[in-house]
């Protein structure tokens, strides 16, 4: 607001004249809603937020022997966020005043179980990991918007004649199974293979299970030429991976919002989105390929990294607005 004032305008005058003696807004520029007195915004309007966050993580590991262990990890988080926005009576943008109070609550937990086995055979080292994971999130929101302020001295919901309540909630859960095998030979060759299976609650029943694998390897060729006064370290690496992802909640059906209007004896409502839901929605898949080389010279004083990376995505999930025709 101050940026739009002339350079010779005394800004102290705005500070001394932002409010009448009865507490209403001092109209200094003919009700311009875009240039409200900034001191009115600072001292009369109110905006507060509060966030409370609690989380906990626990883990239990049991080793059967030096090669095999089981591990259970669980964690949860609870986030509560409250917001209050007050626009006083007589404010040019909202002459009758407005008070909005919102609360948001997000609860989530994540539980994972893995079994890991490591061993060696001659010059080979290998490891196998199997596991499962459950991720759940529960989100709720509640907003009260009060308008038409009748008691101008008291900032409370009871001071307003008109009130609108908006509530929302959604849940989501992903159940996963995964496995990984890693191999190495003589500290020269390394390979990793993974496979993951996810089942999501936000996809259609016939498409809510999806798999995505990955494979990677590396070759430490500098081990073959040790000692070398020039090349301290050299590694060739390559990997291919596929990652699957699901959709946001409520993308499979039309959602309706009720209004305070009636048609005869019937309540009215409207569709809350301009997108037609896809009943055959599929998980999106992203394929990535990477190859590169890492080099270090002169006792690791100089390093060079070269990487080629390519990524392609299929069945991307996005909203496309419906034509008005």
Q: What label would you give each PLM region?
A:
Residues 110, 174-180, 188-190:
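Short glycine-rich loop/turn motifs
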Residues 56-62, 113-117, 130, 179-183, ...:
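Residues on the lipid-exposed face of transmembrane beta-strands in outer-membrane beta-barrel proteins
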Residues 191-200, 240:
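Transmembrane beta-strand segments that form the barrel wall of outer-membrane beta-barrel proteins
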Residues 205-209:
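Short glycine/threonine-rich loop-to-helix capping motif typified by GTGT followed
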Residues 65-67, 73:
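Transmembrane beta-barrel domains of bacterial outer-membrane proteins
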Residues 176, 210-214:
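Transmembrane beta-barrel architecture of outer membranes
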Residues 1-53, 73-175, 202-204, 221-288, ...:
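Surface-exposed loop/interface segments of Gram-negative outer-membrane beta-barrel transport/assembly proteins
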């Amino acid at each position: 607001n101050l940026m739009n004032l002339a350079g010779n305008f005394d800004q102290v005058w705005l500070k001394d004249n932002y409010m009448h003696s009865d507490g209403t807004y001092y109209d200094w520029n003919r009700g311009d809603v875009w240039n409200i007195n900034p001191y009115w915004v600072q001292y009369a309007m109110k905006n507060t937020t509060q966030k409370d966050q609690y989380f906990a993580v626990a883990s239990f590991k049991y080793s059967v022997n030096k090669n095999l262990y089981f591990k259970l990890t669980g964690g949860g988080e609870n986030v509560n966020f409250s917001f209050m926005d007050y626009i006083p009576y007589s404010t040019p943008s909202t002459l009758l005043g407005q008070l909005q109070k919102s609360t948001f609550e997000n609860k989530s937990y994540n539980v994972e179980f893995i079994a890991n086995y490591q061993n060696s055979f001659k010059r080979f080292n290998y490891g196998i990991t199997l596991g499962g994971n459950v991720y759940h999130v529960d989100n709720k929101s509640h907003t009260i918007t009060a308008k038409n302020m009748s008691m101008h001295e008291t900032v409370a919901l009871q001071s307003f004649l008109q009130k609108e309540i908006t509530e929302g909630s959604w849940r989501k859960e992903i159940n996963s199974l995964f496995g990984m095998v890693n191999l190495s030979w003589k500290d020269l060759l390394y390979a990793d293979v993974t496979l993951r299976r996810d089942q999501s609650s936000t996809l259609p029943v016939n498409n809510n299970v999806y798999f995505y694998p990955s494979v990677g390897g590396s070759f430490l060729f500098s081990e073959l030429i040790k000692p070398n006064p020039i090349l301290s370290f050299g590694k060739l690496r390559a990997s291919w991976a596929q990652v699957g992802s699901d959709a946001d909640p409520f993308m499979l059906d039309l959602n309706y919002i009720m209004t305070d209007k009636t048609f005869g004896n019937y309540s009215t409502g409207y569709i809350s989105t301009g997108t037609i839901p896809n009943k055959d929605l599929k998980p999106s898949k992203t394929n990535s390929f990477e190859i590169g080389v890492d080099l270090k010279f002169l006792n690791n004083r100089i390093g060079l990294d070269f990487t080629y990376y390519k990524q392609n995505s299929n069945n991307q999930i996005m909203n496309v607005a419906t034509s008005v025709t």
